[in-house]
UniProtKB/Swiss-Prot annotation:
GO terms for biological process: cell division; cell wall organization; peptidoglycan biosynthetic process; regulation of cell shape. Its EC number is 1.3.1.98. Gene3D superfamilies: 3.30.465.10, UDP-N-acetylenolpyruvoylglucosamine reductase, C-terminal domain, Uridine Diphospho-n-acetylenolpyruvylglucosamine Reductase, domain 2. GO terms for cellular component: cytosol. PROSITE patterns: FAD_PCMH. One of its GO terms (molecular function) is UDP-N-acetylmuramate dehydrogenase activity. This is UDP-N-acetylenolpyruvoylglucosamine reductase. Transmembrane segments: none annotated. The active site is at R176, S226, E296. The keyword NADP applies. It catalyses: UDP-N-acetyl-alpha-D-muramate + NADP(+) = UDP-N-acetyl-3-O-(1-carboxyvinyl)-alpha-D-glucosamine + NADPH + H(+). Pathway: Cell wall biogenesis; peptidoglycan biosynthesis.
Amino acid sequence: MELHTIVDQLKKSIQSEHIKINEPLKKYTYTKTGGNADIYIMPTSYTEVQAALNIARQNDIPVTFLGNGSNIIIRDGGIRGIVISLLNLTKIRVHGHSITASSGAAIIDVSRIARDHHLTGLEFACGIPGSVGGAVFMNAGAYGGEIKDVIDHALVINHEGEIISLDNQALELDYRTSIIQKEHFVVLEASFKLAPGDIQSIQSQMDILTERRESKQPLEYPSCGSVFRRPPGHFAGKLIQDAQLQGHTIGGVQVSEKHAGFIVNVNEGTATDYENMIAHIQETVYKNSGIALETEVRIIGEPL
């Protein structure tokens, strides 16, 4: 079916200004790479998300969901079908010792609002550059904390297009994985169960973690964050460093000289450069240590 026909159907449920055709996705990724989306939409309600999914299902059109593009590499050929951005869904509500946040809200903002309401438990998330939906999707974590520790439940869209609630156990959260990944569900919102705390102590902990992050991570360059999962008993960055790859460059991307676990875009690098670098790192580290590195970053889309 022609794209304009799909767009006409989408316009019945979603405002025209929130629908784009042949949209460059590098505008929305932390790596500043990626090709174009056939159709890119930005729903402003859960009902609009459901409507878009129904249209895609009826027309057998593939759908890809994007949060804030922090831990993802979109290939240079872009993404076919409909890309649904959840970044217009940013509502955050505080009720007692709990916070409920829509999928597109920044997890950093949720941690700050928790602090402002004297609630402890989300300090670890004060520097995670991801959306709430992405954080649940991959059970995001840092400095000893993870989403699994604090999430009470999430509202998700299942395969039938129904909105259902999954509690902590049903989410099957584990190291950088969840039932959301396995079943390709869509997170609409998440509720976090926190505890009362002292605002000065909370801020102090956040300051410590922020200083640690800024001193160790190459925040001055575009990157996708941690590229590789942590191998049991090892650290990916140390293995890469031991393989003499720190500072190594392919095309416009480089293994960060500040933290070897990061690949930074130093000179208009492409997604192909990122993929080539990842493959080179995996091959070299395996030859050097016998350890196979697995990617943490999601790689999606079509090659050129």
